[in-house]
C-alpha cells in the first residue's frame, strides 16, 4: 500500500515541500534563513493576533491600550515585546537571507528573486504601519515624516498624501487604516512566501559552489529538518534573551511619550532596520531626489540578475568579488550607523560618501570586477 503522505492531495504538497524534497547535499547554514523567516512570520502573526484582541485603533485610547496590554493582560507584556523584538529578528533573518542570495548568486532564479524583492517591500510596509500603532511620539512623527515624502511627487503629491492620511494631518483616520493594513499585510506576505517557494521548487535550491547539483541530492527530511531545528532553537533563544533581558534595547525611548502634534522630538528616526535607507534619503539635499534615492536603494535589487557579468554563479571562487561584497556589507552598516545620528558634520558627509559607494558598488564596481575575474580565468 502506498504511503498516504505521497497520495493524499494535501499531504502530497507538504511531503514534496518538507519531506521528500531533493536538496543539494552541500548547502551551508546560510540556507537556514528561509525556514527561520517562516518561523518569524508565524510568530508575528500569532503574537499580533493576541495583541489585536486588546488593542484599540483610536488616537485617544491607542497609547493607553498598549499600556493596558503590558500591565493588565495576562502575559501581555511578553506578547507585546515578543512582537516588537520579533520584528527585529525578522529583519536580521531577512537581510542575512538576501546577503546569502547575493553572495552565492541565488538571484539567477529570476522569478524567485523578484518575488523576494516584492516580499521585502511588503515586509517593510508592514513594519512601518505597525510602528505607528502604539501612538507614541516616534510613531506619530515617523508616520508624518515618511508619508510626507510622497508630497515630493509632482502634481499629485499633496493630494496623494492627504488621501493616505484621510485628512489634513496624521490623525484618527490614519491610525485606523494603518491598523487595517497592519492586520491584512502579514497574510499577503504568507501568500507571497508560498509563491516564492513554488518558484524555488521549480528549479531546486542553489548551493555554495553555484554548480548544478542534480547528481548529488539528498532528501530534505531528516537531514535539513534537523539542521533547521538547530537554527530555529538559536533564533528562539536570541529572541527570548532580547525580550526577557533587554526588551527596549532596539526601541526608541521617545515612543514611551504619548503622541503630541505640538511637540516635535529632537531627532526623528525610524527603527534600526530602516536606518540605512533613511541615511540614503537624508544624504541628498533635495526632497524629490532623496525620495528617488530611497526607492532606488531597494529597487536596485531587482536589477541585480541583469548586472551579473561573471561566468561563475557563486562568489565562492571569486576573491575580488568577495572583497567587494564585504565592502558592501560594511557600507550598509556604516549607513545604518549614520541614519541614527543627527544631521550635522561629519555625519552628513560620511553618509553622502557611503550612499555614493552603495550605488557605485552595485552598479559599477561589482559587475566590472566580475569581468576582470573572467579575464583572469582566461575565459
Curated annotation (Swiss-Prot):
Keyword NADP appears in the UniProt entry: no
| Needed cofactors | heme b
Residues reported to bind heme b b562: 83, 182
What the entry lists under InterPro entries is as follows: Cyt_b/b6_C, Cyt_b/b6_C_sf, Cyt_b/b6_N, Cytb/b6-like_sf, Cytochrome_b, Cytochrome_b_C_euk/bac, Cytochrome_b_N_euk/bac, Di-haem_cyt_TM
List ligand-binding residues for a ubiquinone: 201
SUPFAM superfamilies in the cross-refs: a domain/subunit of cytochrome bc1 complex (Ubiquinol-cytochrome c reductase), Transmembrane di-heme cytochromes
Q: What is its main location?
A: mitochondrion
Output the Gene Ontology cellular-component terms.
mitochondrial inner membrane; respiratory chain complex III
Q: Which UniProt keywords apply?
A: Electron transport, Heme, Iron, Membrane, Metal-binding, Mitochondrion, Mitochondrion inner membrane, Respiratory chain, Transmembrane, Transmembrane helix, Transport, Ubiquinone
Membrane topology designation: Multi-pass membrane protein
Annotated cofactor note: Binds 2 heme b groups non-covalently.
Q: What is this protein called?
A: Cytochrome b
Species source reads Balaenoptera borealis
Amino acid at each position: 500500500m502506498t504511503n498516504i503522505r505521497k497520495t493524499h492531495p494535501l499531504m502530497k504538497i507538504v511531503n514534496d515541500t518538507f519531506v521528500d524534497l531533493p536538496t543539494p547535499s552541500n548547502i551551508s547554514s546560510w540556507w537556514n534563513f528561509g525556514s527561520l523567516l517562516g518561523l518569524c512570520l508565524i510568530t508575528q502573526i500569532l503574537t499580533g493576533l493576541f495583541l489585536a484582541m486588546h488593542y484599540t485603533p483610536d488616537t485617544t485610547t491607542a497609547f493607553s491600550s498598549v499600556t493596558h496590554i503590558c500591565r493588565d493582560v495576562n502575559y501581555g507584556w511578553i506578547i507585546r515585546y515578543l512582537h516588537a523584538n520579533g520584528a527585529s529578528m525578522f529583519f536580521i533573518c531577512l537581510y542575512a537571507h538576501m546577503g546569502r542570495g547575493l553572495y552565492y548568486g541565488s538571484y539567477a532564479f529570476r522569478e524567485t528573486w523578484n518575488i523576494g524583492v516584492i516580499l521585502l517591500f511588503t515586509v517593510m510596509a508592514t513594519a512601518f504601519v505597525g510602528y505607528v500603532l502604539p501612538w507614541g511620539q516616534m510613531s506619530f512623527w515617523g508616520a508624518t515624516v515618511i508619508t510626507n515624502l510622497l508630497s515630493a511627487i509632482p502634481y499629485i503629491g499633496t493630494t496623494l498624501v492627504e488621501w493616505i492620511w484621510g485628512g489634513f494631518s496624521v490623525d484618527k483616520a490614519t491610525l485606523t487604516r494603518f491598523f487595517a493594513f497592519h492586520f491584512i499585510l502579514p497574510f499577503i506576505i504568507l501568500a507571497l512566501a508560498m509563491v516564492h517557494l513554488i518558484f524555488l521548487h521549480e528549479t531546486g535550491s542553489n548551493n555554495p559552489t553555484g554548480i548544478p547539483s542534480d547528481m548529488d541530492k539528498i532528501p530534505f527530511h531528516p537531514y535539513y529538518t534537523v539542521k533547521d531545528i538547530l537554527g530555529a532553537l538559536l533564533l528562539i533563544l536570541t529572541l527570548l534573551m532580547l525580550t526577557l533581558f533587554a526588551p527596549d534595547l532596539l526601541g526608541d525611548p521617545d515612543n514611551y511619550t504619548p503622541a503630541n502634534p505640538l511637540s516635535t522630538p529632537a531627532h526623528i528616526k525610524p527603527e534600526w532596520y530602516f536606518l540605512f535607507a533613511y541615511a540614503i534619503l537624508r544624504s541628498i539635499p533635495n526632497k524629490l531626489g532623496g525620495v528617488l534615492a530611497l526607492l532606488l536603494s531597494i529597487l536596485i535589487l531587482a536589477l541585480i540578475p541583469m548586472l551579473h557579468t561573471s561566468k561563475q554563479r557563486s562568489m565562492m571562487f571569486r576573491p575580488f568579488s568577495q572583497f567587494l561584497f564585504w565592502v558592501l556589507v560594511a557600507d550598509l552598516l556604516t549607513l545604518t550607523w549614520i541614519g541614527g545620528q543627527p544631521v550635522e558634520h561629519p555625519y552628513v558627509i560620511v553618509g553622502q560618501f557611503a550612499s555614493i559607494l552603495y550605488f557605485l558598488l552595485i552598479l559599477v564596481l561589482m559587475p566590472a570586477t566580475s569581468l576582470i575575474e573572467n579575464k583572469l580565468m582566461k575565459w
